[in-house]
């Protein structure tokens, strides 16, 4: 899988950008919000998702881990493909999307072309309670985003995982550790709290 591309934007289109990462040029499909943040001839680091099918190969790009995670959750919902997921990310900002999911706002979600009430219901079932607030994404918890995702992948609720990580990060034992030891301690203690 292509996880990330470092390169220079040499072309911007309506729903994609072209990045040169010598010796290759990649066309990367992006949300309208992502596209608006990027500038022509700017050096960028884009997180990616590679979509492979028999008849096509598409590369989707994201500015941050959370946007990619939401995209991956969306495409795991029956009836939503990568292009529909990207339309959803283009249709509303992260906080708007999160709030619509938490409120089960069918009207807001179904404003996206191709998303009806039935598919909106599936999205709510899949994503409700899994998305964190945008201000939490920029907190010190974000430093341990990979650890958080690993624990969520073990079947734990994201909100409970984030809450446990925040609590553990405040205790003296954690604060006295060197940075390289903090992640192991955090992983072990978070699992203890969530399992106990």
Swiss-Prot record:
Its main location: cytoplasm. The keyword NAD does not apply. Residues 139-196 are annotated as: Domain III. Residues 138 are annotated as: Flexible linker. Residues 1-63 are annotated as: Domain I. GO terms for biological process: DNA recombination; DNA repair. It holds the Pfam family RuvA_N. It is found in: Cytoplasm. GO terms for molecular function: ATP binding; four-way junction DNA binding; four-way junction helicase activity. SUPFAM superfamilies: Nucleic acid-binding proteins, RuvA domain 2-like. GO terms for cellular component: cytoplasm; Holliday junction resolvase complex. InterPro entries: DNA_helicase_Holl-junc_RuvA_I, Hlx-hairpin-Hlx_DNA-bd_motif, NA-bd_OB-fold, RuvA, RuvA_2-like. The keyword Repeat does not apply. Residues 64-138 are annotated as: Domain II. Gene3D superfamilies: 5' to 3' exonuclease, C-terminal subdomain, Nucleic acid-binding proteins. Keywords: Cytoplasm, DNA damage, DNA recombination, DNA repair, DNA-binding. Homotetramer. Forms an RuvA(8)-RuvB(12)-Holliday junction (HJ) complex. HJ DNA is sandwiched between 2 RuvA tetramers; dsDNA enters through RuvA and exits via RuvB. An RuvB hexamer assembles on each DNA strand where it exits the tetramer. Each RuvB hexamer is contacted by two RuvA subunits (via domain III) on 2 adjacent RuvB subunits; this complex drives branch migration. In the full resolvosome a probable DNA-RuvA(4)-RuvB(12)-RuvC(2) complex forms which resolves the HJ. The RuvA-RuvB-RuvC complex processes Holliday junction (HJ) DNA during genetic recombination and DNA repair, while the RuvA-RuvB complex plays an important role in the rescue of blocked DNA replication forks via replication fork reversal (RFR). RuvA specifically binds to HJ cruciform DNA, conferring on it an open structure. The RuvB hexamer acts as an ATP-dependent pump, pulling dsDNA into and through the RuvAB complex. HJ branch migration allows RuvC to scan DNA until it finds its consensus sequence, where it cleaves and resolves the cruciform DNA. HAMAP family: DNA_HJ_migration_RuvA. Belongs to the RuvA family. NCBIfam families: ruvA. This is Holliday junction branch migration complex subunit RuvA. The gene is ruvA.
């Amino acid at each position: 899988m292509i996880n990330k591309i470092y390169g220079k934007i040499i072309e911007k289109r309506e729903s994609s950008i072209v990045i040169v990462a010598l010796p290759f040029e990649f066309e990367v499909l992006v949300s309208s919000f992502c596209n608006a943040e990027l500038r022509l001839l700017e050096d960028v680091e884009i997180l990616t998702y590679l979509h492979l099918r028999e008849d096509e190969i598409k590369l989707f790009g994201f500015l941050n881990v959370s946007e990619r995670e939401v995209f991956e959750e969306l495409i795991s919902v029956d009836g939503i493909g990568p292009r529909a997921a990207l339309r959803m990310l283009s249709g509303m900002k992260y906080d708007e999307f999160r709030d619509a999911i938490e409120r089960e706002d069918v009207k807001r979600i179904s404003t996206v072309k191709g998303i009806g009430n039935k598919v909106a219901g599936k999205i709510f079932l899949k994503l409700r309670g899994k998305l964190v607030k945008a201000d939490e994404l920029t907190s010190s918890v974000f430093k341990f985003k990979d650890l958080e995702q690993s624990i969520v992948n073990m079947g734990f609720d994201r909100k409970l995982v984030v809450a446990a990580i925040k609590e553990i990060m405040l205790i003296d034992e954690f604060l006295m550790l060197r940075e390289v030891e903090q992640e192991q301690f955090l992983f072990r203690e978070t699992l203890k709290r969530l399992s106990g």
